[in-house]
């Protein structure tokens, strides 16, 4: 390092983080590349630079400016054309599986009228705080921050709002302090109403995952949801077949109460990727009700969610 470079005043460990250091008329300004640093590390670097430069006779004032590249956050919508197909369970478990694979993942419960993520992620008693008029997501014990109307409304309170109010609520949940989150999973309500339109218009997703059971009625509605994303030029990442086969815990026999293979066949017909199957399993239902999603464990169902999450990571 040149002796005329003010960065020579700093030890190499600090100088490596300083992109620019100027000293003029007694005022020192250090521009620090803070990408990837936590708040404590940033504070330590600022203190060290201030202390070192403060000992110089030619420096009467020091200002340290932290800069970092803005996180390129992808919004992935999880949707279906109808309720009761396990969309919220899939969204929560995919968020956890993606987090375990190394992503920084946040989860928005966009089902304004029937929020379920606080129960699934065991955050029912948490209340989000606000900073600068924006909500701060609730931290779950699975490493996935989450925001839901269930965190804001009283337990059991019915949300009787017209469409514009629901759309405004969604905006507050998405436009929150998500920090360095690189993937934001949005658990959409069933159907193709105001909440979906608000999201597509204001927070256009990078892609969408469609969830359906194998039965024909659910598939018809899933295809309808797919058309909505097509009209908004949002690519459909693929389809997931949920409740795909029930394994009897006593005899091990597999039955198909909702049919079998319908979603994969629909994906082929629509020329869309088939992302995988999630079985109709008591453990998955019990885990969701108990706030202990199976994707957080190491069982066979965790592997099913991890396999789908891996395909999302590669997309």
Predicted features, each with a name:
Residues 2-7, 15, 34-37, 43-47, ...:
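C-terminal lobe/tail of nucleotide-utilizing enzymes
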Residues 9-17, 24-27, 33-61:
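Short, non-transmembrane amphipathic alpha-helical segments
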Residues 18, 53, 72, 83, ...:
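Residue-level signature of catalytic and energy-coupling elements of molecular machines
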Residues 74-109, 226:
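Walker A/P-loop phosphate-binding motif and the immediately C-terminal alpha-helix
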Residues 84-93, 115-116, 188-196, 218-221:
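Short glycine/serine/threonine-rich phosphate/pyrophosphate-binding segments
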Residues 98-160, 167, 174:
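Phosphate-binding loop that captures ATP/GTP phosphates
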Residues 149-165, 169-198:
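Switch II (G3) loop of P-loop NTPases
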Residues 176-178, 196-217:
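Inter-motif core of Ras-like GTPase G domains
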